Amino acid sequence: MKTPTALLVFEELRDLETYGSILRSSGYGTRMCTSVAEGIEALETEDISIVILDQGTPAFEGRQVLVRSLQLRPEVPVLVIARTLDMHCYLEAMDLGAIDYLEKPDRQDMLWVLDTQMRRGAFA
């Protein structure tokens, strides 16, 4: 079985490095992007198993990556991570097709969600 690759799209480099390190130490490959445009390009050109994106501020800027991901690769699960729970953004993300919406810095929940998706066969 190939190593699943997570596409991380975070505005803040510190968050990107933190979550990337957690994923790599848990056996995942990572592709890290600091902009929506870079994330969408990676979706279009690389073999991505799951997308993990920052909600962004003040509006749900990650929406662009979520929508584009589901258009290009509807089989790839998308997990949204937010600094604080915003019920409007949560409902929008779930309505658009995100598999989950977690508050930072809940790293253990992120790994639990990824492991659950792997067991379900989402990482083909």
Located regions from the model:
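Conserved active-site segment of CheY-like receiver
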Residues: E11, I81-L85, P105
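Two-component/phosphorelay signaling modules centered on CheY-like receiver
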Residues: E12-M32
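Receiver (REC) domain switch/output surface
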Residues: L16, Y90, M94, M110-A124
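Acidic, metal-coordinating helix/loop segments flanking the phosphotransfer/catalytic sites
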Residues: M32-I50
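Conserved phosphotransfer cores of two-component systems
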Residues: E44-E46, R68-E75, L96
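Conserved phosphotransfer microenvironments
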Residues: S49-S69, L85, C89
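Two-component signal transduction core modules
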Residues: V51, V78, Y101-L102
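Alpha4 helix (beta4-alpha4-beta5 surface) of REC/receiver domains from two-component response regulators
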Residues: Q64, A82-Y101
